[in-house]
């Protein structure tokens, strides 16, 4: 392998690492918006034709629906949410990327606190040099009232195998 070939190979590897970092930052930015209550900024993380599936909660298609759906989170009475992401795996192929991350969340509404576990499956696309979500699918493993436990009879939701 010549020096030029080695440099070109290193540049390709570096580009993939930089793309993965930008996709990871996109996911982090989403959860920063959620956790900080900046619901009006979430739409800027999506492509024009994006779709979002939030498990049994909601589906949004297109930026207008995504914007309205997430802004609605901020207007619900006594609604609080904090999300924590783990094990973000990312693949990149040119201007397309996919990612999976695991979710732990706490939310409360009308005085009841819930524990949530699930995962996000994402499809991302580079648009005008910026990585954006084109698809975000949340799969919830369970949502349960805090103190009940995730296998108790009072669970709010438990995904069957």
Which residues fall in each region the model found?
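Extended, polar beta-sheet/loop recognition surfaces of beta-rich domains
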Residues: 149-161
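Short helix-to-loop capping/linker segments positioned immediately adjacent to catalytic or ligand/cofactor-binding
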Residues: 29-31, 75-78, 111
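Short, cysteine-centered beta-strand-loop-beta hairpins and adjacent loop/turn segments enriched
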Residues: 106-113
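A solvent-exposed, acidic/Ser-Thr-rich amphipathic alpha-helical stretch
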Residues: 39-104
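C-terminal-biased regions
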Residues: 9, 79-87, 106, 140, ...
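Short, low-complexity N-terminal intrinsically disordered segments enriched in polar/charged residues
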Residues: 1-32, 36, 44
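Short beta-strand edge/turn micro-motifs at domain boundaries
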Residues: 98, 117-150
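Short, surface-exposed coil-to-beta transition loops
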Residues: 83-85, 115-120
